[in-house]
A protein has these predicted regions:
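ABC-type ATPase nucleotide-binding domains, specifically the catalytic core motifs of the NBD
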Residues: 16, 72, 97-115, 123-128, ...
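The feature captures the beta-strand-to-loop junction immediately N-terminal to the Walker
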Residues: 37-39
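Helix-to-loop junction immediately C-terminal to a conserved catalytic motif
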Residues: 52
Length: 238
């Protein structure tokens, strides 16, 4: 059995008085991809916010490699090896591609050097070709590559990816998929929030389905593929 990389355990979370996560539990194993899927508004991005310390839970626990990190500030959770690629491609639009990566690398407190600015360029040749361009001049797909690269130069052990394929052309989605598969092969643990069900099933080893803030399915990808009723009921597709 894979070592537990990141776990949410019986999480209750609120936005003001709205109970948005109810006893949510799931674990991403070491060097495995956990696909976190569900309809819009199910609570997937909220789980990401809880995991990285942006939204402290009202109850429950977050653990990184069995170390409790619940209610630690985001920078402390990052120091335990957790990085987030958020929705919206949060990059410094007024900096060049190289400057974006260099700033993220300098901010890392982990000390590892597996991923450097140059190794990101090797993984994403398009970024190398545009290293002196402002991030604001990149296409949407290139900005997503840059957001992933910024997370990687922190050299995390756990990578959380929130809708990495959203709004991208099929060719760029294929590039992102290859990168995720490569990262898993290199031992990185990944939690993947993904609306593209086909992509999620292709990349994930394990699946958690959220519906109205609750986990309604937790199992392997193969187990979900054999359960059309669950897919139809909670995702609205066959």
């Amino acid at each position: 059995m894979a070592r537990r990389a990141i776990s949410l355990i019986d999480i209750d979370a609120y936005y003001s008085d709205s109970h948005v996560l109810q006893r949510v539990s799931f674990t991403a194993g070491e060097a495995r991809v956990l696909g976190l899927i569900g309809r819009n508004g199910a609570g997937k991005s909220t789980c990401m916010s809880v995991a990285v310390g942006l939204l402290p839970p009202r109850a429950g626990a977050v653990e990184v490699f069995d170390v409790p990190v619940t209610r630690l500030p985001p920078e402390s959770i990052a120091a335990h090896g957790v990085a987030l690629v958020p929705q919206g491609r949060r990059i410094f639009r007024s900096l060049t591609v190289r400057e974006n990566l260099a700033v993220a690398a300098r901010a890392s407190t982990l000390g590892a050097t597996h991923w450097t600015v140059d190794s990101v360029f090797a993984a994403f040749p398009r970024l190398k070709e545009r290293e002196r361009q402002l991030a604001s001049q990149l296409s949407g797909g290139e900005q997503q590559m840059l957001a992933i690269g910024r997370a990687l130069v922190a050299n995390p052990r756990v990578l959380l990816m929130d809708e990495p394929s959203e709004g991208l052309a099929p060719q760029i989605v294929a590039d992102v998929a290859r990168t995720i598969a490569r990262l898993k092969g290199e031992g990185l643990s990944i939690v993947l929030v993904e609306q593209n069900l086909r992509l999620a099933l292709e990349l994930a080893d394990d699946i958690a389905i959220l519906n109205s803030g609750r986990v309604v399915f937790l199992g392997t990808t193969d187990e979900l593929k054999g359960n059309d009723a669950i897919i139809a009921r909670h995702l609205g597709v066959y």
